[in-house]
Amino acid sequence: RVWNTNPTHPIAQGIPESFELKEEEMYGEFFDIPKPDDVVFLSWYRGGEVFRSGCTWQRGYGKIFYFQPGHETNPSYHNPYVLKVIENAVRWAAPVMWRENLECPNIVESPESKYLKK
């Protein structure tokens, strides 16, 4: 079961309080990650194991979202709520505006330059 622990977060929009995944690979805490800015989803597994399964961070201009469900051998990507979370996360992480070139001296052409050229 995946619990929506932060229903006001943009990634959680349109996601119910909880939803079931028939099969999913189980992970457990201690999950050695930096302290998240937000925990959007928690997963619960039979036996009582709980896992921070949806976390966000912001680093500089970048936004990062980790989402645990979706092992390639399980049908998680067919779940409409998993697909909605991924869609919401892409929209959340997308830049609101293109930023000025960051002037990295060791990079000949910055990755964002192709979007800034007219």
Can you say where each PLM-predicted feature lies in the sequence?
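Catalytic beta-strand/loop cores that center a nucleophilic Ser/Cys/Thr
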Residues: R1-Y61
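Extracellular ligand-binding/catalytic regions of CAZymes and related secreted enzymes
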Residues: G48-R52, Q58-K118
